From Swiss-Prot:
Main localisation: cytoplasm
Binding site for (R)-lipoate: K134
Catalytic reaction annotation: L-lysyl-[lipoyl-carrier protein] + (R)-lipoate + ATP = N(6)-[(R)-lipoyl]-L-lysyl-[lipoyl-carrier protein] + AMP + diphosphate + H(+)
Subcellular compartments: Cytoplasm
Gene: lplA
Pathway membership, UniProt: Protein modification; protein lipoylation via exogenous pathway; protein N(6)-(lipoyl)lysine from lipoate: step 1/2; Protein modification; protein lipoylation via exogenous pathway; protein N(6)-(lipoyl)lysine from lipoate: step 2/2
Protein name: Lipoate-protein ligase A
Amino acid sequence: MSTLRLLISDSYDPWFNLAVEECIFRQMPATQRVLFLWRNADTVVIGRAQNPWKECNTRRMEEDNVRLARRSSGGGAVFHDLGNTCFTFMAGKPEYDKTISTSIVLNALNALGVSAEASGRNDLVVKTAEGDRKVSGSAYRETKDRGFHHGTLLLNADLSRLANYLNPDKKKLAAKGITSVRSRVTNLTELLPGIPHEQVCEAITEAFFAHYGERVEAEIISPDKTPDLPNFAETFARQSSWEWNFGQAPAFSHLLDERFSWGGVELHFDVEKGHITRAQVFTDSLNPAPLEALAGRLQGCLYRADMLQQECEALLVDFPDQEKELRELSTWIAGAVR
């Protein structure tokens, strides 16, 4: 029986693909070597310890229907579209070695006619007239008996969109998470015009087979039916949940301030695990009572636009004469925390 396993996803759903990856990683025998090939439609993927409100322009993402996906490995935030080819290599210990998987990807690129080299801890770069340009970034995860290396190859990504979603608004965040480092990047199509995703996958597959001296049939993972993987439904539910993608953010503080016709407002939030643990309101409004009441209502509230808006509007019952002010406040808060 072959020690290799090759899986190719037909899904462009980042939560689906990351759930497949997680299930395979948890249940694979320690003697198996796995290659999983996949790609995502418009998504910002953040590292396990990152704060999405700090790393991403979450409001712009919502407007453009760009998903947020938190992965189980560390590292920084990246934008995925269908111009990215994603790969995951898995192996048991002590065999797991990220230099092996890196060399497999480099061999695949070489077979396609691209000379690339490893740079730093997790990048692959090509030399151009303008200097080194990144074409691949990776992240890693290890447990006591296994490890994986996953990454992306920039094939024909819309690089102009990176700044749309990875340059956050200038929010006053005092975050305890990790800030991403932006790199100078280029697409492989600059070197190999017109090369399709399927050809890149084939090159990686052949390099994988060549390294291990074995071949195996590909397993196609389809979104049309639930994959036959242990605990897939539960893993997908977690991967796609707000609690995982947003709620796992490191603790942070957020200061919002705005001036309205009826007075200035400052809101100070401390947020842990996606919940407001402390809310303070400061205002020079002539009628501060509804704002003082709001501070109490927001304690323990999910740090989510719709929930904050709901708490604002609930105050209309107790403060009907301040309806105009409360509705203005509600609209502003909902926009500011996205």
